[in-house]
């Protein structure tokens, strides 16, 4: 069993409270058989799709970059918005769209029910005061992937998942409850609360977190325990994933050290997996290079030194692939 010195944990800091931005739920009424173009401000290669799942209409945006040659299978990244945002805002904020148009991979932006995801923290029920989701979001995402794969040339060995805040919690739920589907996961500003499936097989994981995060504290979630559940922090989350992936080493090694961020983690893990934490020294809850359009005070500001967090995540996840291309159909 690995153990981490108390001195490592006590290096951490930060302040604050739980909150979520509120915006009107996304109104979508398109049919899967007839995908429509999104708003003219978007590239013409982004389309909106919907399907019925669990008696609800569930929708997503799909970016097929113009440089993609669909005669050959290409990777697919699932990118999930945070609580109170929607798929349109995530497409703008995360910047994975620009990366995909340079490097040639699909990006799917699913829409959470009531602008939220069921990321697996269910100690208290959803309410008007606490916007969250109690839907089968794992099942919805898998159905969305199956639909995309039926209509596009996706490399099933290179399906990745990312997200921000509540979407990062959902990323980690998918990683531990559908590890047979995803080659790697990397996300922003949230910890893992979902239960791990008995058939979990270690996959690479990276989390990006601002040291000054005022919503999901870097050091601990103790002030928000009624919402988030058992106490977590960025280092605890890293260590939890290292245990889960059977990583060797008593403390994380420093992989990259810069003036405004560092990357530390474990590289010797089961299944050739890795576990990484990217700490942004001057960032708050939004670690991206773009401001969040919802922009509640303090929540929407981008990381002030321009750390290319999305590029870091993509370069990490995209180096991994599954050894098997089995169908995701359950």
How should these model regions be labeled?
Residues 21-22, 26-76, 102, 106, ...:
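A domain-start/cap signature at the N-terminus of enzymes
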Residues 51-61, 71-160, 164, 170-173, ...:
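Serine-hydrolase catalytic machinery in alpha/beta-hydrolase-like enzymes
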